[in-house]
């Protein structure tokens, strides 16, 4: 799947669709890690860690810069991803202890 070899929009769209499937699969793996964190953390207050959140976003932005893609866009996406992950982890924390 090399976009440089595409000659039609159908190829572009098929490539994007495949990447989207892969991204969702990676998100499923990430959320599995959030379930593990919810199981391991001793109290609900430990779920939100602003220092770790900032570190994760900064790491993603640095990787974006390395790959020469817009770091500000990646930062905004990671802000949403981390907040969604925190919400998911809190729900899992509560579910496991109910």
Which residues does each PLM region occupy?
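Domain-level signature for soluble enzymes in the chorismate/prephenate branch of the shikimate pathway
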Residues: 1-98
